């Protein structure tokens, strides 16, 4: 039992570490780059001062489908000076000392409009800005599919229904 628990813990830590590894911007899809550019523009506007804000890593895996949009990334203030362009600059990768990580979220809201919101990572961890970010549509893929059917007031498995519970 101890071995299984240790393996499960190791798998969870590996997954957590892989979700926060640095990103190679040029390897991302054009659609994902467009949404990350929106986060970079907002991050530069709010936190950059005279320095460029750059992409650091994903907070969670990005979802960029027509009906669902959720891109959550960490940004960092770099040692590079700001230019007119807010877009990704591969030469700007060194984080400026004594600057916080920035958590930026680009999502589709429940009313169909797009939200671009950036805040310090520590503020997000302490629950600040929750009222803003809770406006994101958190629809999950497959929620309304046949595979997720349940019968109201009847918890028995339904015969002939693939995946009904």
From Swiss-Prot:
Disulfide bonds join 80-92, 104-118. Keywords: Disulfide bond, Signal, Stress response. GO terms for biological process: multicellular organismal response to stress. Residues 1-19 form the signal peptide. Induction: By oxidation stress as a result of either short or long periods of environmental hypoxia. It comes from the Eukaryota. Involved in hypoxia tolerance. Seems to have a cystatin/monellin-like domain. This is Cystatin-like protein. It comes from Clarias batrachus.
